Structure formats: C-alpha cells, structure tokens
C-alpha cells in the first residue's frame, strides 16, 4: 500500500520534469548556434523607393512643451516638426530598410554592438535599430529636459516598457517581445514626434541600409532562405533565395511610394499629413527611381 502511494506521488513529479526537459530541448533546438562557416556565400543589392515621395508627417510644436528647444531641428516656418520618414539618395536609394535572412539555424557569430539611443533636440537617434529578444539598451538623454520613453510592441500596440529619462542622464531598458511580435516603436510621451523603431532579428545575417540603399550580407552557409526587407511605414517584402558555396547573389527591393501604410489617426484629414510640407534637404512630390 505504501509503495503504491509512493509511486503515485512520484508520477506527477516525473511528468513535470519530463515536460520541463522537453521544453528546454525544444527551445535549445531552435536557438541560433554560432559556428565557423566554410565556403560562405554573399547576398548584396539595393532597396529603392519608386513613384512619388510620400507626404511627410507634421506635429504642431505649439501643442507640446519645450517648444524653443524642440524647434532647433527639422522644423518649418510654421513651427511644425516635420518627420522625414523616407530618406533617399539621388537615384532613389532608401535609408533605414532592415534586410534580414530568415531560417539560418547556425552560422557566424553575432558581434553585435550594444544599442545606444541618443536623445538630442527632442529627437531620437538612430531612427531604426535591429534588436534581439531580451537585449538590453541604453537611452542617452543629451537634452536639459526630461523625456518619458514609452516602448510599444508593434506600431501603437501594447506598451511593454515605460522609461522616464531624466535630463542629461542615461536610462537602461530591455527588449521583451511577446511571441511572434517583431516590431517595437519607442515614443516620448511628452513629445509625440520623438520616435525610434526596432526590428527583431533571429541571427546576425541582417543589414540596415544607409542613404544609398545598398546592403551586403556575407559569410552565409550555403542553402535556401527567405530574404526580407522591412521599412516601418511600408509592407514587408520577401524573396526566396538559394545561395551556393562562395557564390554571390544580387537581390534588389523596390518600395512603391504610393503604398505607404499609415494608421487611421495619421491622415490628411487629421492634419498629421501635410501635402505642402517639405522634407529637409529633399524635393517634395518628385518622381523617384525612374
């Protein structure tokens, strides 16, 4: 009788141990493994914007605190902060497109630099980051005023972190996505036009385009993968590719300026989008990539 009771008591414990072990093995089997890559391949190309330049977003500074300091950059004659979401080169190269290679289970080491987001003149730099799950980051406030950083999971989604940033100080944060979420947006709760974006990466095979729109990802294990291109106001593009040993594959991505994805609260009727506002240093409404 006592032996039967003992066996019955142990069965739930054994089941729990088995479950935990199974979850651990499942997690580890999907974790990226750093290995030495032999005969690695290269993917290179360019992201461009075609069609007409999308209208910029504007924020009336009179509605926000610290107007004198915030008007130091990216402000028009009507005291509107103008957000330059589409930075382009003369030939249409598009900046801040995150290129990622999916389904790489093992390959080169990350060697990723820590994320440091600067806040100066009521503006976050850089405007786009590549982020890993549970990665720490720092917000360096160079302004003499306080900012309140709110981190959203996806665009205007659930707030996953609230970071008060005292004047001229550094605040620490940490990225924690729920399952299947890839995008975070950080906005200052006091100055809504202060925005920066992050895109979740699973491996070190990624690239954030500069002003020329060009990208290059190297040392890739030969195989078949999905190559994605993401811009925070455009639909993600994807191409299935196969790379060979020591080979170079050329891939380009074209984003149509007429197909910007904006939330409903950012429309011309709401006053957030202004047709006659000019991007800093660019010609508005001109044809691109032709």
Model-based region annotation:
Residues 5-15:
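Bacterial N-terminal signal peptides that target proteins for export
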Residues 6-8, 23, 81:
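Intrinsic-disorder/low-complexity peptide segments enriched for small residues
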Residues 14-24:
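Bacterial N-terminal signal peptides
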Residues 26-28:
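N-terminal signal peptide c-region/cleavage motif recognized by signal peptidases
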